[in-house]
Amino acid sequence: MLFRSGRKVLVTTGGTQEALDPVRYIGNRSSGRQGLAIAYEALREGAEVTVLAADTVPFSLEGARIIPTMSADAMFAELKREMPLHDALFMTAAVADAKPREIQRSKIKKNNLDSINLVPNPDLLSSVSKTRTRDQVLVGFAAETDERYEELGKQKRESKGVDFLYVTNVQGGAVFGENETSGTLMDKNGVMKRYDKVDKFVLAKDLVKAVAEKIGEFHG
């Protein structure tokens, strides 16, 4: 097994839902499959795994601790509680960039839908990065629609302060909801590996191995 006894891994997965009213919400197309694959592989390699789950496909992860976190605020609150207890974070969740300034108590009428006021959600990964300890490992994920997605991924890895970042080009809805992924994995030295339509478990295995090795560097 890659992880020594007692090593703890935190995984966020799925797409957050930001309530507009009792019926509607702001969401995205994330299925959570990548995060679930990572959680499965980390469990298989001996880690104690906690999953902060937003909206995902149905799943079963025997041995994992599952905490529902449907909104960005709920996920942020749990991240602040759980991060100090874990050796690594895989931030695979697709967190909404914005939320309604106010959740309406009754269903918004159609003629009022053009006047919804939004406010930015906090940047969860950047916030965690600023407060992590030196021996915690952070893995970020980015979805871009620009052909320069690798360049944008490099900039994001540096600005977020993460050890590893996987960036995908999701132009046209690619990757979301699929069992396969295409993208680029990078660390502080640049591109580690490029993936072209591989099963998400292939990426999960590579990421879990890289993180386990990084934890080993920190703790010997």
Task: Annotate the PLM regions.
Residues 5-7, 135:
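Phosphate-coordination loops involved in phosphoryl transfer and adenosine-cofactor binding
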Residues 17-22, 31-38, 98, 149-150:
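Short glycine/serine/threonine-rich phosphate/pyrophosphate-binding segments
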Residues 21-33, 113-121:
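Glycine- and acidic-residue-enriched helix-capping/strand-helix junction motifs
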Residues 133, 149-220:
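Glycine-rich phosphate/adenylate-binding loop
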